[in-house]
Amino acid sequence: MIKSVIAGAVAMAVVSFGVNNAAPTIPQGQGKVTFNGTVVDAPCSISQKSADQSIDFGQLSKSFLEAGGVSKPMDLDIELVNCDITAFKGGNGAKKGTVKLAFTGPIVNGHSDELDTNGGTGTAIVVQGAGKNVVFDGSEGDANTLKDGENVLHYTAVVKKSSAVGAAVTEGAFSAVANFNLTYQ
């Protein structure tokens, strides 16, 4: 009898051990992390928050815009980080240690300084830097002097009634996309 009890206990232990080993582990939460980036031959890096920005103007009064008003200016900062301007200026050629920005995007017909919006609201976006309207036709703006470390290129953006012939401000959502390119000198 004792031998059969011991044999039964050993058999149960073997079966239990085998079952526990075969049971899959169920995660108690999981996710995925994807890492991306681009290495560029430039004296500065563009901060992540500057490389892909979104500006929300909120709700704007139709009658205010129609009467020639403009929205509250919103900051549009382009942060350049980890700049090594000393080495850049000391490289081949006579380099000044400056950067020029060129903006592109759909423009209001005849008004390269107005970014046309989608949505049929009769609105446009105007971006200013150093007191001047930027153009969205790919032309480079004024040179910005850079220093080692971090540099912030400050712009502001406003919404206004489009200068297109016959434009009228209408209700609805609008959006616009502008791209920028940097040229170091």
From Swiss-Prot:
Gene3D superfamilies: Fimbrial-type adhesion domain (2.60.40.1090). Disulfide bonds join 44-83. It is found in: Secreted; Fimbrium. The keyword Ion transport does not apply. Pfam families: Fimbrial. One of its GO terms (cellular component) is extracellular region. Its main location: secreted. The keyword Secreted applies. Residues 1-22 form the signal peptide. Polymerizes to form the thick (6.8 nm in diameter) rod of the pilus (also called fimbria). The rod is a right-handed helical cylinder with 3.28 PapA subunits per turn. Pili are polar filaments radiating from the surface of the bacterium to a length of 0.5-1.5 micrometers and numbering 100-300 per cell, and enable bacteria to colonize the epithelium of specific host organs. This is Pap fimbrial major pilin protein. Strains of E.coli that cause infection of the human urinary tract produce pap-pili which are hair-like appendages consisting of about 1000 helically arranged subunits of the protein PapA. These pili mediate binding to digalactoside-containing glycolipids present on the epithelial cells which line the urinary tract. Keywords: Disulfide bond, Fimbrium, Secreted, Signal. GO terms for biological process: cell adhesion involved in single-species biofilm formation. It comes from Escherichia coli. Belongs to the fimbrial protein family.
